């Protein structure tokens, strides 16, 4: 793990000659009498707080999490702050273990579509919640996250299997997909959302790193994450005039 240092121009097979009086050139050992032990180079590591398993909770809801039909939105999972108040982190990196979520999506009719027989048509559509890992987090040229269409090609792809577009596969990978195919006869419908995904396992450990350039900016927002951010994409596809409102709670288990 640690590279061996070699002397330039000297190999192990070369014979070394030692003069007889070399022993007289050895330095004299002086015992310290102050009773204090010298601190080795590893003392700094012992001064740092020990990393431990923790969980950070987050609720995502509100006006910014309401989608009209045939629309999508993107957001991120907040990571812990560098500090002493738990849940926290003691380093500029954490190990991501597991992400679980639970919540609801409410489908509402915006405008009643009446067919020729005078019957109000159903609201039929597909709701998707997609969790994505961003290996190299940084804002796009527009100053925001990549959109659903940029990541997966088009929103209509949510009807099938979602895959990262070829040009972004080196940066992103899909961690979890939750899909609900809905048919609503009433004006409103509430649907439960629940799932969990393992991020690190025995064969692979996923570590997230932070920039932490200034003391006041040692937080867990996307702009301060330098490696392995977690993004969430919501999408509601329907031909009916409707909207989808989400309320989802996330719990991130980590070592930090």
Curated annotation (Swiss-Prot):
Question: Quick one: where's region Interaction with Arabidopsis thaliana NSI protein?
Answer: 150-187
Which portions of the sequence form the region Disordered?
18-50
Coiled-coil residues: none
GO terms for biological process?
DNA transport; transport of virus in host, cell to cell
UniProt keyword Lipid metabolism, yes or no: no
What is the annotated localization of this protein?
Host nucleus; Host cytoplasm; Host cell membrane
Quaternary assembly: Binds to single-stranded and double-stranded viral DNA. Interacts with the host nuclear shuttle interacting (NSI) protein. This interaction may allow NSP to recruit NSI monomers to the viral genome and thus regulate nuclear export of viral genome by NSP.
This chain's function reads: Binds to the genomic viral ssDNA, shuttles it into and out of the cell nucleus. Begomoviruses use 2 proteins to transport their DNA from cell to cell. The nuclear shuttle protein (NSP) shuttles it between nucleus and cytoplasm and the movement protein (MP) probably transports the DNA-NSP complex to the cell periphery and facilitates movement across the cell wall.
What family is it from?
Belongs to the begomovirus nuclear shuttle protein family.
This protein's name = Nuclear shuttle protein
Protein source organism: Cabbage leaf curl virus (isolate Jamaica) (CaLCuV)
């Amino acid at each position: 793990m640690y590279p061996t240092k070699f002397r330039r121009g000297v190999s192990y097979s070369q014979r070394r000659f030692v003069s007889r009086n070399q022993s007289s050139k050895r330095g004299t050992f002086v015992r310290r009498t102050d009773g204090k032990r010298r601190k080795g180079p590893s003392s700094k590591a012992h001064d740092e707080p020990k990393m431990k398993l923790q969980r950070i909770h987050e609720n995502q809801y509100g006006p910014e999490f309401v989608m009209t039909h045939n629309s999508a939105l993107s957001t991120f999972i907040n990571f812990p702050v560098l500090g002493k108040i738990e849940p926290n982190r003691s380093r500029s990196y954490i190990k991501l273990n597991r992400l679980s979520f639970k919540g609801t999506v409410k489908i509402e009719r915006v405008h009643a579509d009446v067919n020729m027989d005078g019957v109000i048509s159903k609201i039929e559509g597909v709701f998707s919640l997609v969790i994505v890992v961003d290996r190299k987090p940084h804002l796009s040229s527009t100053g925001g996250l990549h959109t659903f269409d940029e990541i997966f090609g088009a929103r209509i792809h949510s009807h099938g299997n979602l895959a990262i577009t070829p040009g972004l596969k080196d940066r992103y990978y899909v961690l979890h997909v939750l899909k609900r195919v809905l048919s609503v006869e009433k004006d409103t419908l509430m649907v439960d959302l629940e799932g969990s995904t393992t991020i690190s396992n025995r064969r692979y450990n996923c570590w997230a790193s932070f920039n932490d350039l200034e003391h006041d900016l040692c937080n867990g927002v996307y702009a301060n994450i330098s490696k392995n951010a977690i993004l969430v994409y919501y999408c509601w596809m329907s031909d009916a005039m409707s909207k989808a409102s989400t309320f989802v709670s996330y719990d991130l288990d980590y070592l930090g």
